[in-house]
């Protein structure tokens, strides 16, 4: 595997990259739909709606259920979703394989790291803490922390400014076209993980700089050694 040179910092998407969050999100969306006498969508379908933030996910759910997503209906459904998600976020979220171990090694080796997600900000830090990885990040940017979300480059510009990095020095790791497009627009290099959601599309179609199946392969990619062997993704 060829190394990416001159990388001094890493930023990570959250849902579909660091955590498998579809179960918790789907449970909350389905409860919000059923509470309005609408059909439940199910986890496999909801997983294809993840990536653009809660409002867009709610809009997609309403359209799928045959309901016009007016501003009032979206707000009502979003409020229901937020209430239900507060109950399902912890039990319905797990780390993907190799994530915690790899982040720990990167932190030990002094690599500054950020999370950049479109997820509503109030859920992000508690979720990271609950999964035992919150302390690895010097910067956390949620969907409510910027005026425009990914795929706009604004969140990555904020990372560059806060971490004092040039665009060429930041590597953004994500699982969806929004992540890759944001990195490309910001002038950063990108890694596309194959195991995420990405609206049911292959991440290769978005042309990231590197495509990886295993999270731990980030270490040799940026010239860092792994302290122990890790199991491959299955």
From Swiss-Prot:
It is an enzyme of class 3 (hydrolase). GO terms for biological process: carbohydrate metabolic process; DNA repair; glycolate biosynthetic process. Pfam families: HAD_2. One of its GO terms (molecular function) is metal ion binding. GO terms for cellular component: cytosol. CDD domains: HAD_PGPase (cd16417). Pathway: Organic acid metabolism; glycolate biosynthesis; glycolate from 2-phosphoglycolate: step 1/1. It catalyses: 2-phosphoglycolate + H2O = glycolate + phosphate. The active site is at 13 (nucleophile). The keyword Chloroplast does not apply. It comes from the Bacteria. Keywords: Carbohydrate metabolism, Chloride, Hydrolase, Magnesium, Metal-binding. Its EC number is 3.1.3.18. Mg(2+) binds at residues 13, 15, 175. Belongs to the HAD-like hydrolase superfamily. CbbY/CbbZ/Gph/YieH family. Specifically catalyzes the dephosphorylation of 2-phosphoglycolate. Is involved in the dissimilation of the intracellular 2-phosphoglycolate formed during the DNA repair of 3'-phosphoglycolate ends, a major class of DNA lesions induced by oxidative stress. Monomer. This is Phosphoglycolate phosphatase. The lineage of its organism: Bacteria, Pseudomonadati, Pseudomonadota, Gammaproteobacteria, Enterobacterales.
């Amino acid at each position: 595997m060829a190394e990416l040179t001159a990388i001094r910092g890493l930023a990570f998407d959250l849902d579909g990259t660091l955590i498998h969050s579809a179960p918790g999100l789907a449970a909350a969306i389905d409860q919000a739909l059923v509470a309005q006498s609408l059909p439940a969508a199910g986890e496999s379908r909801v997983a294809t709606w993840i990536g653009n933030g809660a409002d867009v996910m709610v809009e997609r759910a309403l359209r799928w259920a045959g309901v016009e997503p007016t501003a009032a209906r979206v707000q009502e459904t979003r409020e229901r979703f937020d209430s239900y998600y507060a109950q399902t976020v912890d039990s319905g979220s797990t780390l993907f394989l190799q994530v915690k171990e790899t982040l720990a090694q990167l932190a030990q080796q002094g690599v500054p790291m950020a999370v950049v997600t479109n997820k509503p900000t109030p859920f992000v830090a508690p979720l990271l803490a609950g999964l035992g990885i919150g302390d690895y990040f010097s910067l956390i940017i949620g969907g409510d922390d910027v005026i425009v979300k990914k795929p706009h480059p604004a969140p990555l510009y904020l990372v560059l400014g806060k971490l004092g990095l040039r665009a060429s020095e930041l590597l953004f790791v994500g699982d969806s076209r929004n992540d890759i497009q944001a990195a490309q627009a910001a002038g950063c290099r990108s890694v596309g993980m194959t195991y995420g959601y990405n609206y049911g599309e292959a991440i290769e179609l978005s042309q990231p700089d590197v495509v990886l199946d295993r999270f731990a392969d980030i270490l040799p990619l940026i010239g860092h050694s792994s302290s122990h062997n890790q199991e491959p993704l299955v």
